[in-house]
């Protein structure tokens, strides 16, 4: 789909490389520029005492890319990036704006070299405002600053960190979408543009329903416990064999009678305390207690059949071990085989990129590269002579 699109990725860690990997899975040619020593995420498992050749965290964001190592602290290294950008379609970076400007790698500088360039800047907080040059990571910019962390705290609880790269990869999707939209425009007009994505803005968008309520009414409801829900049947419950599951109640009175039948409490269908939304809200704790007792009389397998028979919208609360064996994950194409970096033809299971294109090659295009694996190849494609390439390696400008 994106075959023929050239992407220069000047980025480390996860959010921007994740966007680059989505584009690569979709067919773009992605060249990753790494600092001497490589992207720090290459060391993810070594920091916890392992020395794996395959690094599933790094590979997930970098499979199929080319890698060049350039010392961008040197003017000659910065010049090499400018050469690479001249015939690129996309420049993707998560370097802070101030550093890019000092290096002459900001949008205004690069668009003079390539007016059709789609330049995607992925930062913590955006390109304008007092915090534009502040370092950003997902737990700070996406999770904490946005209010998402606060909204997820149960009453009386404390803030807790989100899982690895949750906000990063959400922002990867946003950046990839923005890049694709700008590529369509560039194809129509012949002119590129600046695409601005940030962890902060994406975090605000993900909680946009609550933020919309806050902006409109000046307040928002706090996160309540199971027995305090406004819609108590939209909740989490536990089975006799200690399996948790969620129920999502539809609008109106659609689900109350079916749920009563599931737990064999048909007499409650017409009980005035519970037979309308207002009554259930006023008696939330009692509703939850009744359903807890009813659901707790069944093992998950038996209860699943009863819920399905009544067309209740529900889902199990799965562990990642459960997900890794879930047939629906494979049927949806959400788990794919990634070529091993060992180069022996073996593969291992890894998450797919977020969108499926039936009939298209939308999966991994190869293993993740070793640091600088393609440096000489890329320099040669820029027209550099063999002697020039050797000199660049000898000087430490590239590796």
Role assignments for model-derived ranges:
Residues 145, 172-193, 205, 209-216, ...:
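Oxidoreductase and adenylate-handling cofactor-binding alpha/beta cores
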Residues 165-180, 199-207, 251, 255:
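Mid-domain beta-loop-alpha active-site segment that forms a flexible
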Residues 308-332:
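Conserved PLP cofactor-binding pocket of PLP-dependent enzymes
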Residues 233-310, 314:
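Aromatic-enriched alpha-helical interface/lid elements that frame and gate functional surfaces
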Residues 127, 156-166, 187-203, 223-229, ...:
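Conserved Rossmann-fold dehydrogenase catalytic segment
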Residues 1-188, 370, 376-399:
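N-terminal helix-loop segment corresponding to the beta1-alpha1 unit
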Residues 340-393:
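Flexible, small-/acidic-enriched active-site or ligand-binding loops
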Residues 58, 224-229, 235-236, 345-351, ...:
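Short Gly/Pro-enriched turn/cap motifs at secondary-structure boundaries
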């Amino acid at each position: 789909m994106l075959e023929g699109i050239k992407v220069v990725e000047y980025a480390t860690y996860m959010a921007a490389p994740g966007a680059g990997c989505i584009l690569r899975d979709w067919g773009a040619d992605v060249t990753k520029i790494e600092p001497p020593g490589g992207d720090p995420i290459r060391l993810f498992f070594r920091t916890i005492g392992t020395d794996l050749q395959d690094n599933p965290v790094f590979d997930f964001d970098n499979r199929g890319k080319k890698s060049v190592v350039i010392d961008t602290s040197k003017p000659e290294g910065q010049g090499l990036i400018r050469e690479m950008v001249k015939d690129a379609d996309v420049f993707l970076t998560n370097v802070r704006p101030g550093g890019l400007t000092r290096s002459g790698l900001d949008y205004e500088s690069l668009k003079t070299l390539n007016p059709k360039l789609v330049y995607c800047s992925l930062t913590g907080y955006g390109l304008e405002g007092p915090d534009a040059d502040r370092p950003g990571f997902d737990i700070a910019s996406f999770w904490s600053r946005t209010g998402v962390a606060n909204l997820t705290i149960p009453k009386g609880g404390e803030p807790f960190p989100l899982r690895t790269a949750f906000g990063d990869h959400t922002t990867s999707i946003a950046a990839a979408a923005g890049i694709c939209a700008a590529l369509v425009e560039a194809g129509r007009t012949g002119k590129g543009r600046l695409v601005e994505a940030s962890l902060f803005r994406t975090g605000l968008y993900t909680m946009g329903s609550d933020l919309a309520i806050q902006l409109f009414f000046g307040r928002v409801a706090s996160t309540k416990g199971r027995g305090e829900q406004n819609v108590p049947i939209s909740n989490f419950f536990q089975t006799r064999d200690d399996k948790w599951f969620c129920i999502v109640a539809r609008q109106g009175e659609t689900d109350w009678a079916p749920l009563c039948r599931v737990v064999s409490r048909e007499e409650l269908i017409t009980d005035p305390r519970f037979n309308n939304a207002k009554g259930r809200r006023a008696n939330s704790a009692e509703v939850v207690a009744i359903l807890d007792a009813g659901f707790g009389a069944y093992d998950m397998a038996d209860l699943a059949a009863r819920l399905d028979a009544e067309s209740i919208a529900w889902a199990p609360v799965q562990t990642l071990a459960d997900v890794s064996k879930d047939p629906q994950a494979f049927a949806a194409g959400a788990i794919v085989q990634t070529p091993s970096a060992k180069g022996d033809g073996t593969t291992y299971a890894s998450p797919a990129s977020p969108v499926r294109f039936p009939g298209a090659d939308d999966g991994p295009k190869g293993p993740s590269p070793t640091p600088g694996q393609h440096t000489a190849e890329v320099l040669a494609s820029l027209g550099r002579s063999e002697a020039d390439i050797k000199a660049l390696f000898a000087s430490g400008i590239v590796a």
